[in-house]
């Protein structure tokens, strides 16, 4: 038995917080009608879909690269790092269940770029895969909901920025709050946080 694994990430564009990736191997009971691009789902429907994916997927894993790693590596490389961590989370689960060989025949990644997962792993990037490949759609949903929850929790830790509303994305209100009270500890210092600021 061999499986197809889908990987996607969320959080390239925000000014604050981590970039988050998910890797998913679907199960036969996973409802395919729920598996569409996470951006096309309302927050409530995303959470419903995420709960079903976690309940019915054969394997799933989440990977993170935090704001410090984003600043050190750049957002592209940090996203690839989060993807590798998500995939390795799945492989660790498989090994913990006694599997000597990782039974994944191919990994499909949303977008134009894919992470290096080792010579034994076939990886292919699929442009628009979050809307066409169910495994990637599922990963998109898990990545988005996991990151959103993290940002909502940080809204209470760092009040005044509105993280629960915009999840760190560069809205006008978010930029205004940065200009008013300065960046929080989880803001990405390598990003242009306010319009007049040059990225360093």
Task: Please name every model-derived segment.
Residues 1-200:
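RNase H-like, Mg2+-dependent phosphodiesterase core
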């Amino acid at each position: 038995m061999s499986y197809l694994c889908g990987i996607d990430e969320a959080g390239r564009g925000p000014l604050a917080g981590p970039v988050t990736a998910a890797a998913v191997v679907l199960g036969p009971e996973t409802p395919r009608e729920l598996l569409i691009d996470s951006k096309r789902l309302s927050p409530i429907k995303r959470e419903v879909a995420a709960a079903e994916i976690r309940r019915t997927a054969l394997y799933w894993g989440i990977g993170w690269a935090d704001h410090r790693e984003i600043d050190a590596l750049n957002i592209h490389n940090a996203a690839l790092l989060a993807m590798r961590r998500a995939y390795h989370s799945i492989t660790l689960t498989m090994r913990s269940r006694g599997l000597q060989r990782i039974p994944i025949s191919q990994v499909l990644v949303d977008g134009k770029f894919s992470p290096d997962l080792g010579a034994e792993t076939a990886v292919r990037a699929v442009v628009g895969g979050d809307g066409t490949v169910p495994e990637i759609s599922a990963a998109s949903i898990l990545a988005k909901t996991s990151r959103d929850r993290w940002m909502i929790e940080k809204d209470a830790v760092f009040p005044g920025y509105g993280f629960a509303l915009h999840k760190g994305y560069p809205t006008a209100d978010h930029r205004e709050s940065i200009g008013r009270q300065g960046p929080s500890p989880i803001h990405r210092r390598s990003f242009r946080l306010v319009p007049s600021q040059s990225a360093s």
